[in-house]
């Protein structure tokens, strides 16, 4: 674990771990701790009231953040014929089939998102052991296996984030960058929370949205009062 800077240690002393902060105050504290020379990511951890060990309580999906992520997303698409042309027109960085699969097998993967037309899964399916561990395997549940490859490409380029609850029942995601103003960060977090609520499993009991905390890439986490998140 990276050592905390003097400024981060001082801030850690200012943050009350038992307190729920209004979103604006939480973000102000997080930005104060973001001392790296690069434009740090502002991240969120959402504790959900689910048992992620049960298959019917795995929360997974994708949402387009209205204000983007502040990052340029490189998109690869497995498609052929008309679908390949649609993907290129929508702005895909790499489009192919067997040639793209060969590139992946060679370890050449200059992309952040992989999208596949349904008829391309015969090729993509052979790449599971490579793409899966990297979180790149296309999946219909998050809209990356779809006949509408153009929309999928546009969504990825517009700032779509994929989310999946981990074994501890927590969803981790970015909501922007330190350079974003509070309104943009709040709008992005509100969109993520809305998507999580829509993805709530029918079998989830009790309080669903349990804890929300924001942090920077290298900073401390600050708990947020969920009543102050709505954009």
From Swiss-Prot:
* Pfam families xrefs: Ribosomal_L1 (PF00687)
InterPro entries with a match to the protein in the record: Ribosom_uL1_bac-type, Ribosomal_uL1, Ribosomal_uL1-like, Ribosomal_uL1/biogenesis, Ribosomal_uL1_3-a/b-sand, Ribosomal_uL1_CS
One GO MF term attached to the UniProt entry: rRNA binding
Provide the leader sequence positions.
none
Give any single GO term for biological process: regulation of translation
Q: Which GO terms describe its cellular component?
A: cytosolic large ribosomal subunit
The record's function comment reads: Binds directly to 23S rRNA. The L1 stalk is quite mobile in the ribosome, and is involved in E site tRNA release. Protein L1 is also a translational repressor protein, it controls the translation of the L11 operon by binding to its mRNA.
Q: Which family does it belong to?
A: Belongs to the universal ribosomal protein uL1 family.
Q: How does it assemble?
A: Part of the 50S ribosomal subunit.
Q: What is this protein called?
A: Large ribosomal subunit protein uL1
Organism of origin = Acidovorax ebreus (strain TPSY)
């Amino acid at each position: 674990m990276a050592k905390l800077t003097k400024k981060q240690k001082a801030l850690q002393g200012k943050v009350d771990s038992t307190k729920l902060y209004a979103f604006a105050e939480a973000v102000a504290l997080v930005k104060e701790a973001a001392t790296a020379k690069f434009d740090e990511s502002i991240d969120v951890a959402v504790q959900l009231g689910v048992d992620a060990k049960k298959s019917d309580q795995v929360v997974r999906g994708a949402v387009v953040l209205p204000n983007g992520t502040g990052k340029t997303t490189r998109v690869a698409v497995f498609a052929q014929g008309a679908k390949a042309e649609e993907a290129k027109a929508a702005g895909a960085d790499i489009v192919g089939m067997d040639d793209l699969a060969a590139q992946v097998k060679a370890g050449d993967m200059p992309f952040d998102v992989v999208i596949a037309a349904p008829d391309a899964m015969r090729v993509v399916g052979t790449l599971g052991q490579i793409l899966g561990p990297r979180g790149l395997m296309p999946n219909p549940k998050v809209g990356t296996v779809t006949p509408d490859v153009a929309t999928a490409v546009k969504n990825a380029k517009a700032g779509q984030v994929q989310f999946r609850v981990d074994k501890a029942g927590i969803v981790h995601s970015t909501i922007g960058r330190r350079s974003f103003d509070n309104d943009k960060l709040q709008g992005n977090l509100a969109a993520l929370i809305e998507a999580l609520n829509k993805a709530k499993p029918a079998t989830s009991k009790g309080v669903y949205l349990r804890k929300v905390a924001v942090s920077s890439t290298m900073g401390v986490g600050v708990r947020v009062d969920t009543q102050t998140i709505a954009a």
